[in-house]
Amino acid sequence: MCAFPWLLLLLLLQEGSQRRLWRWCGSEEVVAVLQESISLPLEIPPDEEVENIIWSSHKSLATVVPGKEGHPATIMVTNPHYQGQVSFLDPSYSLHISNLSWEDSGLYQAQVNLRTSQISTMQQYNICVYRWLSEPQITVNFESSGEGACSMSLVCSVEKAGMDMTYSWLSRGDSTYTFHEGPVLSTSWRPGDSALSYTCRANNPISNVSSCPIPDGPFYADPNYASEKPSTAFCLLAKGLLIFLLLVILAMGLWVIRVQKRHKMPRMKKLMRNRMKLRKEAKPGSSPA
């Protein structure tokens, strides 16, 4: 029974919209971050009185009927997926979506029905949800051929990368830099060639991450080195050494503080005994009867 008044309201809104003039306000690309919030701004002419606002995405999302003379607006969220996830910001009732998921990507539109001019405006948004990228992972495929020549391919990837990813490689020599587009880098080496290092860079519209530099010398010297995932090993080794150094500094600091306390305690006790002795000597002795 509670749903019947809302159903009647929607039917009346649809019937009234058939006699209106329509005005298209364009489409807007909106970049959003996974598990964060986004607001879809809605522009309403200041001299117009709004009859209602209908938000939709794939299907009806919510209907907003502004209140009159200080009364609150009537808001009905019609899509269960957005219950507790959306709110509407005064004074234009822009749509605010919190805790974004991949499913929230896609087209959204706002239909604003104006009471005074009998005109309906339509504004569209395309939400693209992305996530912050983690450190790139490198896969190495190593092959050796005759006459001491070697070839190697490096494949760069990011876990749960999502859409619109781009990859590039930076090859660095003694005094040269070379850029390569794409996630796969193929290279070769012959005796006498100078050693290079390779860095993968991964990008999406909201973040930019790079791998640790990978030297090619260990690969050509030892083909089994390719199975050790050097970029991850180097990064873990550097982080481990840094943590170990911090722990050593912390332990030395605690030891110094403890030694200082040990030296201070006998002095404090001796000082307290001297004070007590002086106080006793300062008191007048009892005279004999």
From Swiss-Prot:
All ranges on the Extracellular side of the membrane: 19-236
Ranges in the topological domain labelled Cytoplasmic: 258-289
Residues spanning the signal sequence: 1-18
GO cellular component, one term: cell surface
Presence of keyword Glycosyltransferase: no
BP GO annotations: immune response; T cell activation
Keywords from the named record: Disulfide bond, Glycoprotein, Immunoglobulin domain, Membrane, Signal, Transmembrane, Transmembrane helix
Transmembrane portions of the chain: 237-257
Domain Ig-like C2-type: 136-210
Positions annotated as glycosylated: 99, 208
Tissue expression notes: Expression is predominantly restricted in hematopoietic tissues. Expressed in heart, spleen, liver, intestine, muscle and testis. Expressed in immune cells, including monocytes, dendritic, B- and T-cells. No expression was seen in peripheral blood leukocytes. Expressed in the leukocyte cell line THP-1.
PANTHER family cross-referenced by the UniProt entry: SIGNALING LYMPHOCYTIC ACTIVATION MOLECULE, SLAM FAMILY MEMBER 9
Function of the protein: May play a role in the immune response.
Protein name: SLAM family member 9
